[in-house]
């Protein structure tokens, strides 16, 4: 029997998802194919070129002008434009305000568009 691991898109400019048990944040478990992207542009490029992953882990502060919140906004627009459900997600950011903003954005999208 052939099984294919699920894909986790790990957005973080600093934390290596394969070290220090960061995969505890994975919304789809630990048996995953990890794609580590470190910037807004890498995040968008991966999704456009490969489609949506099974799960996404968001960091907020990416060490550049664009943040994880900007990635989440782009993702919501992409899902709306393409009539897609949001992948399962988690937020591993140490920035409590950024974490809350990402979570509110994605939760509002799920409640307003996916449940209607």
What spans do the regions from the language model cover?
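Catalytic phosphate/metal-binding cores of nucleic-acid and nucleotide-processing enzymes, i.e., regions
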Residues: 1-116
């Amino acid at each position: 029997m052939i099984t294919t691991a699920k894909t986790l898109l790990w957005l973080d400019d600093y934390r290596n998802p394969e070290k220090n048990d960061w995969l505890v944040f994975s919304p789809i478990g630990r048996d995953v194919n990890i794609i580590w992207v470190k910037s807004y542009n890498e995040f968008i490029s991966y999704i456009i070129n490969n489609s949506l992953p099974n799960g996404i882990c968001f960091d907020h502060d990416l060490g550049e002008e664009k943040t994880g919140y900007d990635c989440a906004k782009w993702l919501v627009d992409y899902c709306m434009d393409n009539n897609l459900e949001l992948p399962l997600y988690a937020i591993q950011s140490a920035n409590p305000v950024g974490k809350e903003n990402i979570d509110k954005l994605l939760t509002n999208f799920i409640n307003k568009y996916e449940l209607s």
